[in-house]
């Protein structure tokens, strides 16, 4: 008997389609004339790299589900995996059209700035000769041409690499397929045209033009560039079943990912359908996953264009954002003991507006302070040259107990984390690797000191990674406190992790997987009670993604009870506001601006009874019940007021903030007499506060 499918609720949106709407907002910034021209190139490249990762991970997962004998349905809209993949492909084709229009606009606007990307047919005869010589001497010697035959099977295509493909014809009329890798670290991707400064040609286009030189015995019947995207959704839980070192097993899995099945293939121009079918057969690709692109298959070359523009001097500065650098927080006097100051008052750092150096300086001070007996820390994504790691190494070398939980399963950072785990172990740190079935995504650091009063704690809880690079690019919050009730509970969290367990009960912190979702639901229930008693009730949430169905349903219940709900959700949002009878008391905006919005703030209650937290967790099921996450209450009145002001400012952002409407679209909004960019305002405030030495 066929299972009856429930009708989806009118306030639910599919997760994957919501993500595509987010990436469209990124693409819109590439076409936004209010964004400096060179920065719009960055948004175009980010859009493409985001989409690559989406196909590698999300589409890869859905395609794995399609292989299952059981039909898997998404729990909010009841779409099957197959239906979702089709909807994703259809939406991607629409976005590809928009991307091509925006790319052509960008290229058109770059021309008056002296920048042109051209094809070979735009060259003069002399220029063509120069580039032919360049091809013969600098590119051709490094190319490996493959003509497919029984003796030379179809080569393995690397993920996201560009290849030239051609249909060759012999004098006797037989056809053969040829494929040539175009990516090589030896030659440049962006080739200068010597006679025309600022004019460039992409190396893959030059290779494509000179294919006849590589296949002199054949006629080139068809030619194109292609690029494939491979599934990257590896099952990291299998490493717990391996009878080998955890780190070695993880290295093996990362190698395995490079050879997984393709999920998408892109061509740079229309090409013979039979040739497409042949390539699809070779790589086991569904022809519905083939895309034709009017835009270069890899947009990372735009950063070379930006570098060229920067070298042109001051007149090109207007093409970039105004230079900004993080300020040292006025909350701390850098020449005095940071530990002593934090004992007196809590500190809240706001990145990228304030410098992460205040935290790294604290770690170095702890590494050298005789009263410090241990430092415990969770690490998820680290900078290439990490001062955080250097400080921990110094602490271990100074005889401190240093315990570090390195999450090796941080997607696409596995290899970096493996190397850092070795470095920490070699320095004498105790390194552990997370829990079976649960990623440790929390941002938690505990410094333990032995004083005359006994053991005392300094705790840091953050919303973002311990990464000096991303702290200048992402908005994040970092609370540093000497409140002992927070420190004692953080110590319990680490004790559980060291035993391979998760904490069962908390009183101050919210800790997933067992003590976060339920406590959030309780606080929403409290607001529902106030609303039902005809008292003012309020919930304010800032997160990156909202997919947790349990929390969504509870927010709908709160809206129906009359609770005012304001949300800043940067990316995926499966909740549609403004639906009569369900979500008319919910307002949701998304901010996509210069910096990646990454901080998480939870607010419950009116000012006189407000509870406010910063957290590492989004409201996604993976965060609330399948990861170790930590949210910390902000107890200092000054810091609470500062967070309230930040949240309220973001809700007023009508420069980068787009409002989610009841029909599931995002629209521009007008809130202020003059448009307000919250990120720009926060930077201005950081500069002023640093000058005044007050906050």
Model-based region annotation:
Residues 1-539, 557-561, 573-695:
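N-terminal localization/anchoring segments of enzymes in phospholipid and broader phosphate metabolism
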Residues 564-568:
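Hydrophobic alpha/beta core scaffold segments
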């Amino acid at each position: 008997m066929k299972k009856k499918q429930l009708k989806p609720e009118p306030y639910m949106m599919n997760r994957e389609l919501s993500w595509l709407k987010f990436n469209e907002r990124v693409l819109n910034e590439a076409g936004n004339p209010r964004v400096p021209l060179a920065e719009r190139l960055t948004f175009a490249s980010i859009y493409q790299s985001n989409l690559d990762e989406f196909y590698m991970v999300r589409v890869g997962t859905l395609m794995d589900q399609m292989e299952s004998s059981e039909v898997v349905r998404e729990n909010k809209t009841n779409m099957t995996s197959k239906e979702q993949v089709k909807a994703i492909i259809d939406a991607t084709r629409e976005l590809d059209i928009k991307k091509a229009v925006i790319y052509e606009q960008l290229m058109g606007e770059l021309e008056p700035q002296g920048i042109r990307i051209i094809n070979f047919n735009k060259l003069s005869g002399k220029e063509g000769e120069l580039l032919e010589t360049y091809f013969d001497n600098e590119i051709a010697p490094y190319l490996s041409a493959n003509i497919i035959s029984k003796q030379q099977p179809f080569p393995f295509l690397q993920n996201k690499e560009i290849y030239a493909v051609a249909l060759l014809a012999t004098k006797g009329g037989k056809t053969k397929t040829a494929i040539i890798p175009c990516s090589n670290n030896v030659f440049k991707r962006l080739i200068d045209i010597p006679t025309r400064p600022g004019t460039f040609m992409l190396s893959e286009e030059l290779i494509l033009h000179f294919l006849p030189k590589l296949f002199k015995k054949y006629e080139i019947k068809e030619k194109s560039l292609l690029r494939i995207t491979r599934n990257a959704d590896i099952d990291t839980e299998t490493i717990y079943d391996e009878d080998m070192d955890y780190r070695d097993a993880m290295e093996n899995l990362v190698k395995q990912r490079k050879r997984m099945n393709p999920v998408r293939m892109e061509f740079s121009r229309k090409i013979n359908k039979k040739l497409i079918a042949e390539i699809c057969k070779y790589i086991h690709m569904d022809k519905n996953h083939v895309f034709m692109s009017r835009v270069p298959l890899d947009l990372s070359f735009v950063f070379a264009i930006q570098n060229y523009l920067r070298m042109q001097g001051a007149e090109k500065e207007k093409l970039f954002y105004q230079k900004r650098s993080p300020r040292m927080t006025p909350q701390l006097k850098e020449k005095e003991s940071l530990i002593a100051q934090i004992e007196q008052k809590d500190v809240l750092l706001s990145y990228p507006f304030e410098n992460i150096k205040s935290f790294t300086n604290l770690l170095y001070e702890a590494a050298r302070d005789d009263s410090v007996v241990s430092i415990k820390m969770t690490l998820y994504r680290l900078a290439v040259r990490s001062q955080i790691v250097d400080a921990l190494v110094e602490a271990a070398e100074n005889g401190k107990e240093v315990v570090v939980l390195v999450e090796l399963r941080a997607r696409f950072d596995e290899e970096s984390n493996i190397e850092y785990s070795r470095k920490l172990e070699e320095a004498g740190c105790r390194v552990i690797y997370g829990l079976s079935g649960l990623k440790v995504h929390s941002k938690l650091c505990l410094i333990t000191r032995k004083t005359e009063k006994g053991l005392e704690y300094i705790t840091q809880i953050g919303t973002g990674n311990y990464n000096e690079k991303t702290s200048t690019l992402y908005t994040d919050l970092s609370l540093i406190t000497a409140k002992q009730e927070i420190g004692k509970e953080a110590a319990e969290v680490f004790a559980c992790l060291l035993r391979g367990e998760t904490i069962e009960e908390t009183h101050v912190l919210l800790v997933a997987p067992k003590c976060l979702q339920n406590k959030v639901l309780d606080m929403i229930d409290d607001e529902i009670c106030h609303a039902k008693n005809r008292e003012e009730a309020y919930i304010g949430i800032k997160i990156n993604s909202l997919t947790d169905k349990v929390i969504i349903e509870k927010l709908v219940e709160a809206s129906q009870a009359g609770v005012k709900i304001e949300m800043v959700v940067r990316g995926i949002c499966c909740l549609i506001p403004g639906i009569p009878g369900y979500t008319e008391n919910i307002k949701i905006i998304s901010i996509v601006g210069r910096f990646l919005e990454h901080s998480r703030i939870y607010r419950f209650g009116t000012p006189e009874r407000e509870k406010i937290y910063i957290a590492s967790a989004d409201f996604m099921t993976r965060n609330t019940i399948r990861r170790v996450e930590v949210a910390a209450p902000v107890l200092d009145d000054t810091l609470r007021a500062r967070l309230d002001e930040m949240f309220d400012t973001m809700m007023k952002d009508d420069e980068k903030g787009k409002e989610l409407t009841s029909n599931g679209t995002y629209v521009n909004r007008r809130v202020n007499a003059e448009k307000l960019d919250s990120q720009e305002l926060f930077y201005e405030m950081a500069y002023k506060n640093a000058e005044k030495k007050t906050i």
